[in-house]
Amino acid sequence: METNFKSGFLSIIGRPNVGKSTFMNKVIGQKIAIMSDKAQTTRNKIQGVFTTNDAQMIFIDTPGIHKPKHRLGDFMVQIAEDTLNEVDSILFMINADEGYGRGDQYIIDLLQKVNSPVFLIINKIDLIHPDQLLPLIEKYKSLYDFEEIIPISALEGNNVDHLVDVLKEHLPEGPQYYPEDQVTDHPERFVISELIREKVLHLTKEEVPHSIAVVIENIEKNENEKLLIQATIVTERSSQKGILIGKQGTMLKNIGKQARRDIEALLGSKVYLELWIKVKKDWRNRQNQLHEFGFRSDEY
């Protein structure tokens, strides 16, 4: 390893649905953090690893900051706050088309307590007129002393390469923590469950999305060398179970079809996906079930 190899951990933080997962997936080049047009889709810290010949960045994608409504919400916000004290740099991401809000001030107040450099990332610049950008920059400049302010469009890829170069410049010298071909530190089961959950979020509406968890029950190869994946979608109410199954099972088939496509792309092999639905009342407020479904923390 060269003596000037750089590496570091970077936290991506912001209000719900500002495009944090979209940005990380664009940088890494694979879908490892789920994306949805519904807020609060990211639950566990997801580490995306980006490696070049002279640097390695480990991105931590946190739940969006929001006012919690239940113990799962408390858990999500606690993860986001904890990461501020664990990382080498912080990326505070905002939506260009939403402007300054109370949720942003809450995050800025949190940032006053940290020593790591903070970069303001203004995302979704493709949704505003260029004349709207400068007033937004001036507003945030008056609120906090950011290391740099960088406008991007994570979805379109605009200015993302420049942002990565800037972040690389600020990395400390350090070891290569992960092999160069590794893009996440999460096991396959976790990423597969996230891909299934993404399809539920995308295809269902109203109260169903944030009332669901996905548990991978079994992964094995069958006699035809096809990967058999069995998973359970857990929801809180029987009425939600009906929505997830759909008329004559059409919704569940749709979820399975779309999830299978992404899982096959991830694993590079043919997949047979079996999905079941289970009702676990009020699971988001039950510590033992949060633990069972993969939310491992003393801060539920």
Swiss-Prot record:
Domain (KH type-2): give its ranges. Answer: 204-281
Q: Does the keyword Cell membrane apply?
A: yes
Q: Could you tell me where this protein is found in the cell?
A: Cytoplasm; Cell membrane
Specify whether Manganese is a keyword of the entry.
Answer: no
Pfam families, alphabetized:
KH_2, MMR_HSR1
CDD domains linked: Era, KH-II_Era
Give the matching PANTHER family: GTPASE ERA (PTHR42698), GTPASE ERA, MITOCHONDRIAL (PTHR42698:SF1)
Q: Which family does it belong to?
A: Belongs to the TRAFAC class TrmE-Era-EngA-EngB-Septin-like GTPase superfamily. Era GTPase family.
This protein is called: GTPase Era
Q: What is the lineage of its organism?
A: Bacteria, Bacillati, Bacillota, Bacilli, Bacillales
Instruction: Write the gene name.
Output: era
